[in-house]
Amino acid sequence: MKFGTVWKYYFTESLLKATIRTPSQLNLAPNALRPVLDQLCRLFPQNPTVQIRPIRLAGVRGEEIKAQASATQLIFHIHGGAFFLGSLNTHRALMTDLASRTQMQVIHVDYPLAPEHPYPEAIDAIFDVYQALLVQGIKPKDIIISGDSCGANLALALSLRLKQQPELMPSGLILMSPYLDLTLTSESLRFNQKHDALLSIEALQAGIKHYLTDDIQPGDPRVSPLFDDLDGLPPTLVQVGSKEILLDDSKRFREKAEQADVKVHFKLYTGMWNNFQMFNAWFPEAKQALADIAEFATSLDLD
């Protein structure tokens, strides 16, 4: 690895630790962190080859992002942010790249955040959005549900809820840096806590405090879908970085899902931190991750 490349990784990790991870360890109010995160994410360049249109589905604000080519499949993405951060603004650039790389339509939404909207408001809103897509005439076989970090938690929870009506199950599931165990028992939370440039244990703990009400425990499968019955899930792509504190959430999901005969495509990216896909403009691992998503999504379209 060339010196310039090493410096780029070091500089980026240092910047993320200073501007995002460290502030997240200070127990700041969500309203203090949200605008800062929105502004920082403006640094990510949007792909100019796609069209962005504001939409509203089931009363939830969102965006429809279309590539130039006509696509038969739609990616419904649920953003991350520890259940109390994240927005259309923070993830717009990644969504434009996702639409461009897959040449598929992408929908993402501003679902209700904790603590103003604790469990189950987020998952209920996301379920309603999915139902609204079906009402519009979009077929489940043409939908891929996607999510990053806590958004992957909600994406998996949505898919598990849809098992009650198998005819509504999407064609595939994409879990980027998934956060699936709110009991925080994964070993990687300890051994990677100094290596993950973006996400801190304190941020996860704050999110749990904001998200859960007194009548639901962190180990409840409704909020920790890793503990649910995974049988019947569609083909699933899991992407995780080797430096993530959530690394073992992905590994544990892979093991349990494969035991349930779920077709799992597991991708590990060396040296990457939580939500590294957002950095695809600068790092080859993140660019490769989008290529892997496109390959996975296209394979579903061919089935």
Curated annotation (Swiss-Prot):
Active site: S149, E244
Keywords assigned by UniProt, alphabetized: Hydrolase, Secreted, Serine esterase
Pfam families from the UniProt entry: Abhydrolase_3 (PF07859)
Cellular component GO terms held in the UniProt record: extracellular region
GO molecular-function terms, A-Z: carboxylic ester hydrolase activity
Note, other: Acinetobacter lwoffii RAG-1 has the ability to grow on simple triglycerides such as triacetin; mutants defective in esterase lose this ability, but retain the ability to grow on acetate.
Similarity section: Belongs to the 'GDXG' lipolytic enzyme family.
Protein name per its UniProtKB record: Esterase
